[in-house]
Amino acid sequence: MNAENHQSRQTESVLSIPSEQLTPGMRQYQDVKRQHQDCLVMLRMGDFYEMFYEDANTASRELEITLTARGKGERQAPLAGVPFHTLETYLGKLIKKGYKVAIVEQLEDPKQAKGLVKRGLVRIVTPGTVIESSLLEEKENNYILSVTSFENGFSLAASDLSTGEFFT
């Protein structure tokens, strides 16, 4: 792959690639990304959570991890990944920087899978929906706010999911 093609692949969106040009695993990634374009998608592949294309570029920059590539020739896709056992650490860093993260897990044991391992979105984590005590500041609230307008005014609801507090 020449330098010009490599550079264009680094800035290319996985959504701009026709599905038939992708591997089955990359199509799984593309399907989740298509439905959750505002999220960084972390796809469990064996012992790693992997991010591709624009998400790989963002993760590499924000998490200070290596940006590499998967595939050969014209099909090379920017890739950044973290070991599965470090998910909470890296998820915390992304959440603190304001990112919304979609976690895609393997839904079956890869050793038992016939063909492509089934994967599915198991959760979306945002700064307002995180409930893991290890990812929260102990002495700070973590509110999420909802605003609804109607003909004669508006209403507000605020909740801290980590403590169960709810205000209207």
Model-derived features: positions:
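Basic, polar low-complexity surface loops/patches
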Residues: 1-168
